[in-house]
Amino acid sequence: MMSERALTAFYGGTFDPIHYGHLRPVIALARLVNLQRVILLPNNVPPHRPQPVASAQQRLAMARLAIAELPDPIFTLDERELQRPTPSYTVDTFEALRREYGPDSPLAFIIGQDSLLTLTQWHRGLELPALCHLLVCARPGYDYGLADERDNRWLARRLTRDPQALHQQPAGLIYCAATQQLAISASDIRARYREGRACDGLLPPSVQGYIDAQGLYR
């Protein structure tokens, strides 16, 4: 049973398509920091990357299929960003979530190392720790340093190695997890489908079946 102050983590992305590179590191992260709930936040209009190939409803369907296959029931979905016609700015979403969950509930946003390195380029990106913790999953080829020394000092003030601290305050900390680094990307999977190459082992079988049935990424 979930306590009233249990840490709730959100994981955003286009999920075009959702794959094991999304899921397995987050499952490992959940074990490291004792997450009882991870809520996927599919983007509608991502402001920092090309627009998705699959429609919002197709990406939502693939996410549902993927989490239904997982043995751990911690994953759920939040469709709010798919219902916005405007860009999916994370800070706007977390301002709304903070109002909903209240000032004392621990909230976290899961990102990859690549996203941490570009956080200063996000819309009000450095304001996020005022609203939530940041949980950072390792990514191949990236480190944890920011380009600017002042930004590195900003990062250092918020870093924690104590997973329990994430449960004891509502926001403000950055936890960098040594999760498994998987060289799986949605762009590579889309290219494989275009070129007729196999994608076995890269994404859940039910998602593969959906892609085939819908004729996606051809």
Swiss-Prot record:
InterPro entries according to UniProt: Cyt_trans-like (IPR004821), NadD/NMNAT (IPR005248), Rossmann-like_a/b/a_fold (IPR014729)
Sorted UniProt keywords: ATP-binding, NAD, Nucleotide-binding, Nucleotidyltransferase, Pyridine nucleotide biosynthesis, Transferase
Family annotation (Pfam families): CTP_transf_like
Functional pathway: Cofactor biosynthesis; NAD(+) biosynthesis; deamido-NAD(+) from nicotinate D-ribonucleotide: step 1/1
E.C. code: 2.7.7.18
Xref: Gene3D superfamilies: HUPs
Single Gene Ontology BP annotation: NAD biosynthetic process
An example Gene Ontology molecular-function term: ATP binding
Catalytic activity: nicotinate beta-D-ribonucleotide + ATP + H(+) = deamido-NAD(+) + diphosphate
Enzyme class: transferase
Domain of life: Bacteria
CDD domains documented for this protein: NMNAT
Job of this protein: Catalyzes the reversible adenylation of nicotinate mononucleotide (NaMN) to nicotinic acid adenine dinucleotide (NaAD).
Protein family: Belongs to the NadD family.
Name of this chain's protein: Probable nicotinate-nucleotide adenylyltransferase
UniProt organism field: Sodalis glossinidius (strain morsitans)
Source organism phylogeny: Bacteria, Pseudomonadati, Pseudomonadota, Gammaproteobacteria, Enterobacterales
